[in-house]
Amino acid sequence: MMSFLVSIASIAMLVKIVLGTFANVFIVLVNFTDCIKKRKFLLADRILTVLAIFRFDLLWIILMNWSSSVFHVGLYFQVRFCICVVWIVTNHFNTWLANILSILYLLKIDNFSNLIFLGLKGKIKCPYIVLLPCFVLLFPNLIMVTICETTQANGHQGNLTGKTKLTYFTNLIAMTFTLGSLVPFTTFMICFLLLICSLCKHLRTMRLYGKGSQGPSASTHIKVLQVLISFLLLFSMFILLLIISDYNYTKSLEEPIHLICQVIGTLYPSRHSYILLWGNKRIKQAFVLAMVQVRARFWLKEKKP
């Protein structure tokens, strides 16, 4: 029964990673192709491209962690520290770049008359200032990983105190990761609430002048809101499943709850890439065109005798 569950979970994990990889590679190719053609690389496109690259790395790190922990446990304990460090770095930048992208989407809305937003629109051309907290908050996570790995090495030597510390620090690193995600998550929630306020203000203005609730500005608000809500749900689910998985990690790598949490948690990096693809009009059009061309080629091959 356990081997059957592992097989089903592995197939589901592989399918999600392949689909997520396809979306991220497509985003990078479309952005680079447009950059070469137009000789112009907008800030939002640059951030989206870097996010897709980090998302690609994260997906394959997740696959490496899965295959080594489930099928090669001995190998897993040898490469665990390297996988953990790379996973934390890639996931950290994934979270922050997605957060910065949501800020850019917010600042695209021209409905704000607040001086803070007018100032931000002028300074957002320098994203390095926004990325500064990202680099600062990365170091505590890496320090906690090093402490956790040292404690785990002592715990495997049969020291009861070390084993107790192993459980403590494994749980502590999960909490450190959660706290490290608190800043971008809070920023994201502020953007989300401000966008709702902006939409309500816009709808009131439209109704006041008898223009109804339809219009390009309202459509832009709703589209950005849909992207942000999707990210909010997926990221919240990812954090919750990560905490549950880490608390069960100290019991067994093959605990059903641990396997299920990992498989469902992969929805965040794989599905969110498609949401970003759908939310970008230019990339969405290229994706639809590519799918139509692929379908036409298959149809022509089937028609040939």
From Swiss-Prot:
Q: Which residues lie on this side of the membrane: Cytoplasmic?
A: 31-46, 91-99, 149-176, 245-305
Q: Name one GO molecular function term.
A: bitter taste receptor activity
Topology Extracellular: residue spans? 1-9, 68-69, 121-127, 198-223
Q: Could you tell me the membrane topology recorded for this protein?
A: Multi-pass membrane protein
GO cellular component terms, alphabetically, are: membrane
Q: Which GO terms describe its biological process?
A: detection of chemical stimulus involved in sensory perception of bitter taste
Grouped into one coarse class, the protein's main location is membrane
- List locations, semicolon-separated: Membrane
Keywords annotated in UniProt: G-protein coupled receptor, Membrane, Receptor, Sensory transduction, Taste, Transducer, Transmembrane, Transmembrane helix
Q: What are the annotated disulfide bridges?
A: none
User: Any stretches that span the bilayer, and where are they?
Assistant: 10-30, 47-67, 70-90, 100-120, 128-148, 177-197, 224-244
Question: Does the keyword Membrane belong to this entry?
Answer: yes
Q: Which Pfam families match?
A: TAS2R (PF05296)
- What family does this belong to? Belongs to the G-protein coupled receptor T2R family.
Write down the PANTHER family for this protein, in alphabetical order.
Answer: TASTE RECEPTOR TYPE 2, TASTE RECEPTOR TYPE 2 MEMBER 136
Q: What additional remark is attached to this entry?
A: Several bitter taste receptors are expressed in a single taste receptor cell.
Stated role: Putative taste receptor which may play a role in the perception of bitterness.
What is the protein named? Taste receptor type 2 member 136
The scientific name of the source species is Mus musculus (Mouse)
